[in-house]
């Protein structure tokens, strides 16, 4: 009878906060909307055969006691994911081109669209951060009906994946069709000078930041978890960071190419 009451109470009140916020998206991890493997891929993936063989060789060469081996084993989590979540099936990748066009859309689309889409996108990202931005999460858990029934805050990023293509389409439409006939006021027409400036500075800014991350991302993003830093010896941690940084740079380079081609077109 007691068990039944407890079960009923739990169902009525929803999930406890700790369980609900367990799958909270990391703040920097949000950038994998643009660069997919910024924090790795699926936590269920295994490293490449070459990577696994190298790790095994390093452990066999350097680990000399069972105590050291236990510490190393405790330090290893997922080789292919190093974000804030306990595990993931993969990043919430939106696409470099879509993100770039969405960014432009916030400058080109009509104000009646851009402000509410921008506001909804920001709110969605703050909610996806969960325990990493408790001010918003606590309010929604305490005051928004049924919100505490959802398990993973990160899943709300699906809203952004709908809003970004929407603002991108609205922005592109106005970019190509804004003239005296389509606009209600002459001052609302997007001038060629305005379009060129926005396109130029947006491209330079986004490509510049991505290029900086390609060069200095190892010190900015870390590429390791707190658990790995605590338990893994420096030679293993450095090897993991180097391998992960190589993976990141491949995706960052692809993003630069895609954005560059899109901007040029």
What feature does the model see in each segment?
Residues 1-105, 218-256:
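Periplasmic/ER-lumenal interhelical loops and adjacent helix-loop junctions
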